[in-house]
């Protein structure tokens, strides 16, 4: 409870940064023994977003949108999205892929704003999952 009270005092940008840290740690741990979602190499992985987190904040913390990705594909190949998309469909299935894409399209029409309580919920969820 004390943690939640301390989190409520933080700004949205500070909460988002904390949430990103815990979420990315979860993704790296979840996918640590798997190959890069784009190129298939077994190497140190980062949390690579299929739909850009900056352009599509609604799916920033969506586990179907973020997978282990090598630094080369994530940074130097801008996500290496063509093989990422096919491997993503293979991994999560067409239905979940379509749902993810629909969420992005819908948010572009309706807009999306961060909420302190939503971010605190994400922080608490992924902090617990990382224990």
Regions found by a protein language model. Give the residues of each.
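A boundary/linker detector
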Residues: 1-22, 100-101, 106-131
